[in-house]
């Protein structure tokens, strides 16, 4: 963590960014990233726990979403205020 003491910016990190533990963690992180990248190219519907997302889509117990209901036709009217006037057609009878 970075902090300021006596007008100087100090860093409290005790380990070097090039230490052996950092390099091994970075290496294994890169290996896992590359492995998961190619695994999702081959099997794109793979979820985090390794199951197919199609079969475990609702594995948390929620269930599928409800039926969407009827689709309403016409203009949106929420009952707030008067209806707008009819469109002007300029019908002067010519």
From Swiss-Prot:
<keyword id="KW-0256">Endoplasmic reticulum</keyword>
<keyword id="KW-0813">Transport</keyword>
<feature type="compositionally biased region" description="Polar residues">
    <location>
        <begin position="49"/>
        <end position="58"/>
    </location>
</feature>
<keyword id="KW-1003">Cell membrane</keyword>
<feature type="transmembrane region" description="Helical">
    <location>
        <begin position="20"/>
        <end position="42"/>
    </location>
</feature>
<dbReference type="GO" id="GO:0032469">
    <property type="term" value="P:endoplasmic reticulum calcium ion homeostasis"/>
</dbReference>
<keyword id="KW-0472">Membrane</keyword>
<dbReference type="GO" id="GO:0005886">
    <property type="term" value="C:plasma membrane"/>
</dbReference>
<keyword id="KW-0406">Ion transport</keyword>
<dbReference type="GO" id="GO:0005794">
    <property type="term" value="C:Golgi apparatus"/>
</dbReference>
<keyword id="KW-0106">Calcium</keyword>
<keyword id="KW-1133">Transmembrane helix</keyword>
<dbReference type="GO" id="GO:0005789">
    <property type="term" value="C:endoplasmic reticulum membrane"/>
</dbReference>
<dbReference type="GO" id="GO:0006816">
    <property type="term" value="P:calcium ion transport"/>
</dbReference>
<dbReference type="InterPro" id="IPR024491">
    <property type="entry name" value="Se_SelK/SelG"/>
</dbReference>
<keyword id="KW-0109">Calcium transport</keyword>
<dbReference type="GO" id="GO:0005783">
    <property type="term" value="C:endoplasmic reticulum"/>
</dbReference>
<keyword id="KW-0712">Selenocysteine</keyword>
<comment type="function">
    <text>Required for Ca(2+) flux in immune cells and plays a role in T-cell proliferation and in T-cell and neutrophil migration. Involved in endoplasmic reticulum-associated degradation (ERAD) of soluble glycosylated proteins. Required for cell surface expression of CD36 and involved in macrophage uptake of low-density lipoprotein and in foam cell formation. Required for palmitoylation.</text>
</comment>
<dbReference type="Pfam" id="PF10961">
    <property type="entry name" value="SelK_SelG"/>
</dbReference>
<comment type="similarity">
    <text>Belongs to the selenoprotein K family.</text>
</comment>
<feature type="region of interest" description="Disordered">
    <location>
        <begin position="48"/>
        <end position="94"/>
    </location>
</feature>
<protein>
    <recommendedName>
        <fullName>Selenoprotein K</fullName>
    </recommendedName>
</protein>
<dbReference type="GO" id="GO:0018345">
    <property type="term" value="P:protein palmitoylation"/>
</dbReference>
<keyword id="KW-0812">Transmembrane</keyword>
